[in-house]
Amino acid sequence: MANVVVVGAQWGDEGKGKITDLLSKSADVVVRYQGGVNAGHTIVVKDQTLKLHLIPSGILYPDTQCIIGAGTVVDPKVLLEELEQLEQLGVSTENLLIAETAHVTMPYHRQLDIAAEERRGSRRIGTTGRGIGPTYADKSERTGIRMLDLLDRDQLAAKLEWAIAQKNLILEKLYGLAPLEPQPIIEEYSAYGERLRSHIVDGSLVLDDAIRRRRNILFEGAQGTLLDLDHGTYPYVTSSNPVAGGACVGAGIGPTMIDRVIGVAKAYTTRVGEGPFPTELLDEVGELLGDRGAEFGTTTGRRRRCGWFDAVIGRYAVRINGLDCLAITKLDVLDELPEIKVCVAYDIDGERCEHFPSNALKFARCRPIYETLPGWQQSTRHCRSLDDLPKAALNYLKFLAEIMSVPIAIVSLGAERSQTIIVEDPIHGPKRALLKDDGTQVHPILS
């Protein structure tokens, strides 16, 4: 299998959990490299649906080691709840490891997150209110609490007493909120450390050993490319780096250790929260996509905004991540539509633009330029090969592959593992198209 990164190629919620689950059966190690409880994926265990926010999908495979990397921010309370849920269903959690240098989300982070968002008013970003941004802010300011701090009560107490004194100034003076008492928090988080002690390790050392032993490693990103702190639709982004490059920093390995990058994108586009969304549909088609796709956030429960597939941001995701291939999910959601549109470029103040603009104000002025393709108006959920697909559905996939110059390796047609078409080997199959010597494009084919 080699070492593979799975990234979201849109604004998150692309169905990475299912794709990671499919690939995890061939992995020896699965690593979550960034984000926190602001992301989530749904898994099914013994006919019961679980929503996990921190634990990698590979936890369902007893021989697969799962690592929460240093680039993540960990809410220990939520993590322990997830562990207990899995154990109650008979799923072993002994194979879960947590990087000792991962930062910890504290109660004051959640309070500050919610208070800041409320204070922004009409300028709100649309955060989940889970304290992720403030946790990463403390990490950057070098005042954060790390998992290793939870294992030394005296060290934890000293750090928390200082941190809480600083946060209380902000809570009281800026937001008019009641101050926090440090002692209960010290006791609570020290207890979390004891309960998690056996899971906390030097994550980079474990990964280095796995690499040297030629183990197959799967790196699992949260959110999506367009939510990346540096490369997304800033400021309407998350506080970490979901892009493929973030896997090396967040896991603690060198870039030469990555063999392949797989992007995941829906057959249409969704977005949660605020921010520009050129292909957003505020009509009955958008409602249909939301209803058929069950578009509600795993973490917040908020209804997702829905729109047509945006190949401009798709090409951007291919470029920023160096995608080798794509997995297209939820193709079945389009089954009822008589026609399907794909945004191939933007109109910005009367000029055609085929590239994603980094300026959020400019991006907000983008108007989609569409290509319209015929729909297939029949169910695809039973299809298990390309030959089973209606011709119009196959043509739609080919169009996406060509316009983004990247092969499609996987097509998902529902939530179940069986509702999947493996077009090409996602690990060893064809890679992204290159340019000919004369500069013309070599278009990838679907099969």
From Swiss-Prot:
Residues where IMP binds: 13-16, 38-41, 128, 142, 223, 238, 302
Catalytic activity: IMP + L-aspartate + GTP = N(6)-(1,2-dicarboxyethyl)-AMP + GDP + phosphate + 2 H(+)
UniProt GO molecular function: adenylosuccinate synthase activity; GTP binding; magnesium ion binding
Residue positions binding substrate: 298-304
Pfam families: Adenylsucc_synt (PF00709)
InterPro entries found in the cross-reference section: Adenylosuccin_syn_GTP-bd, Adenylosuccin_syn_Lys_AS, Adenylosuccinate_synth_dom1, Adenylosuccinate_synth_dom2, Adenylosuccinate_synth_dom3, Adenylosuccinate_synthetase, P-loop_NTPase
SUPFAM superfamilies: P-loop containing nucleoside triphosphate hydrolases
Gene Ontology biological process terms in this record: 'de novo' AMP biosynthetic process; IMP metabolic process
Cofactor info, note text: Binds 1 Mg(2+) ion per subunit.
GO cellular component annotations of the record: cytoplasm
Binding positions for GTP per the UniProt entry: 12-18, 40-42, 304, 330-332, 412-414
Keyword field: Cytoplasm, GTP-binding, Ligase, Magnesium, Metal-binding, Nucleotide-binding, Purine biosynthesis
Top-rank EC class of the record's enzyme: ligase
Assigned EC number: 6.3.4.4
Ligase in keyword set: yes
Highest taxon, organism lineage: Bacteria
Family: Belongs to the adenylosuccinate synthetase family.
Reported function: Plays an important role in the de novo pathway of purine nucleotide biosynthesis. Catalyzes the first committed step in the biosynthesis of AMP from IMP.
Name of this chain's protein: Adenylosuccinate synthetase
Gene transcribed to yield this protein: purA
